[in-house]
A protein has these predicted regions:
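Extracellular fibronectin type III
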Residues: 438-465
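Beta-strand-rich modules
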Residues: 422-444
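A non-catalytic alpha/beta surface segment that caps or lines the substrate-entry region
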Residues: 83-155, 291-294
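Acidic/histidine-rich catalytic neighborhood of metal-dependent amide-processing enzymes
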Residues: 144-149, 174, 180-271
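Conserved aromatic anchor
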Residues: 379-391
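N-terminal hydrophobic or amphipathic helices/low-complexity stretches enriched
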Residues: 29-108, 124, 155
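Active-site-adjacent substrate-binding region
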Residues: 254-369
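Extracellular low-complexity, O-glycosylation-prone stalks/linkers
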Residues: 391-412
Length: 469
């Protein structure tokens, strides 16, 4: 589908508008006005005409189910606390990483930090990572400074066309967001996220994956998520198929805090962001069941935000992961030092990230939504979809819309898939229906966009109940 105006005009508009925006970052309480960009056309699945002569399989049973993959488990065990400690200490050693700090020194300021991150991606990338700076302008509170994201891309090798973005902002700040001279330690916020990002890149670069993975270190988050906005808007304009954006910000933990993480996803029950959050929670529970993911049905903490909001704004599925409890006394303070972080906690967050990213990147393609039709029997539905020849089976989800978690899945082998009837559902309940593909190692793809059936299906399918892309 063509756009009513040229892509060049849209890009020019975005760059001009970017210079006019400048509000506080993740640590302040004034929300940032979001840039209004052209709304993407509604996703239209490829034309699929069901085979009326195909055999219908009713209430199938399958032994092809999600399982712990030994190769992914081995990668998880490679996560090194020593590496994480070294990365956080290195980030703190730059003195400050404020967006307005020195860019020429080799040892102090944001310029030294970004060059070190760039070189570290090259060092750990096993010759597979394509590393580049993504430069952009930033104006904030009457000041301007050129900025750079550091982007490391691990191209997909299995024919997949999805892009998984794993991100963490590398800048920090003292109390004054424009103070580029004063010391700003920024160990947990967000040296911990950068450490996770680099350690994940080190481990995942040792393998090839079906989908493309982008490791994104963003700048100027503290002044208003400028770097994430620039990346997300350009990915949107370039028609990138971002299937997941995972934001890690302040994930280091401290001694004595509850052993879980919080996951923020806006409009969790009905949005694509919520679907990504459910997938994340499910895979995390499979691989690290003793380190729970607690779902937060919100874009972020009240009055706060992070880089993922820029991906939400352009319609890419995006979530934020953050430690279980924050210490407000450490926020934008020089007390936020490397020695207060719980590296066992940070290691477990990194392991969850590896499990989720490896399943998304190593599993089959995300299926297109099935056609769902009610049958004569109340509570019975027929699902029809094209079967991926690479898939070994499928998971089918009939999720009551008032439930934020997945129900018990129904499973079907590929040879029985494509025309499946499920019975025994409650005809008085509105369900969100989706499917995911499984490979022969038990890796689960992302779930298809949910289709709604039941008494209130029309309201949900029309999008009238949602306020986000």
């Amino acid at each position: 589908m063509g756009w009513p105006v040229s892509r060049a005009i849209i890009r020019t508009f975005l760059l001009l508008a970017l210079g006019l925006l400048g509000l506080a970052g993740c640590s302040l309480l004034e929300p940032q006005p979001q840039l209004v960009i052209p709304t993407p056309p509604a996703a239209t699945p490829a034309l699929f005409i069901p085979d009326a002569s195909g055999q219908i399989v009713t209430d199938p049973v399958s032994d092809v189910v999600p399982t712990i993959d030994p190769l992914i488990e081995a990668l998880i065990q490679e996560t090194s606390q020593q590496q994480l400690i070294a990365y956080v200490r290195q980030m703190e050693s730059f003195g400050t990483r404020n967006a307005f700090s020195d860019t020429q020194s080799e040892t102090f300021g944001i310029g030294a930090a970004r060059r070190w991150i760039f070189n570290e991606f090259l060092r750990v990338g096993n010759g597979r990572l394509q590393v580049e700076f993504q430069d952009f302008p930033m104006s904030y509170s009457g000041y301007s400074a050129d900025q750079s994201n550091v982007v490391a891309t691990l191209p997909g090798a299995g024919g997949g066309n999805g892009v998984i973005v794993i991100m963490a902002h590398y800048d920090d700040r003292p109390a004054d967001a424009t103070d580029g001279a004063s010391r700003a330690t920024g160990a947990n916020d967000n040296g911990s996220g950068v450490a996770l990002l680099l350690e994940t890149a080190r481990i995942m670069s040792s393998r090839q994956w079906n989908q493309t993975i982008v490791f994104l270190a963003t700048s100027a988050e503290e002044q208003g998520s400028f770097g994430a906005r620039y990346f997300a808007e350009n990915a949107f304009l370039d028609s990138e198929n971002v299937i997941a954006a995972l934001n890690y910000d302040a994930v280091g933990g401290r001694a004595g805090i509850p052993q879980h993480v919080r996951l923020f996803a806006v409009e969790y029950a009905i949005s694509r962001h919520g679907a990504l959050g459910r997938y994340y929670e499910y895979i995390a529970g499979l691989y690290l069941p003793t380190f729970p993911v607690l779902i937060q049905d919100a874009l972020d903490r009240e009055g706060r935000w992070g880089d993922h909001r820029e991906f939400v704004a352009v319609g890419f599925p995006a979530i934020r992961v953050i430690e279980s409890v924050e210490d407000p006394e450490l926020l934008n303070s020089n007390r936020d030092t490397w020695d207060l972080i719980d590296y066992n906690y940070l290691q477990r967050v990194a392991q969850i990230n590896l499990a989720v990213a490896a399943n998304l990147a190593g599993g089959p393609q995300q299926p297109q939504p099935p056609l769902v039709a009610g049958m004569a029997e109340p509570g019975a539905f027929l699902l029809t979809w094209p079967v991926d020849p690479v898939a070994a089976g499928y998971a089918i989800s009939f999720r009551p819309v008032d439930s934020i978690y997945y129900p018990t899945f129904k499973f079907v082998k590929s040879e029985n898939a494509g025309n499946v009837a499920l019975t025994g559902l409650d005809p008085n309940v509105t369900y969100a229906v989706s499917i995911a593909a499984l490979n022969d190692r038990g890796l689960l793809s992302g779930f298809s966009i949910e289709q709604f059936v039941g008494p209130d299906a029309a309201s949900y399918n029309s999008g009238a109940l949602s306020s986000v892309p």
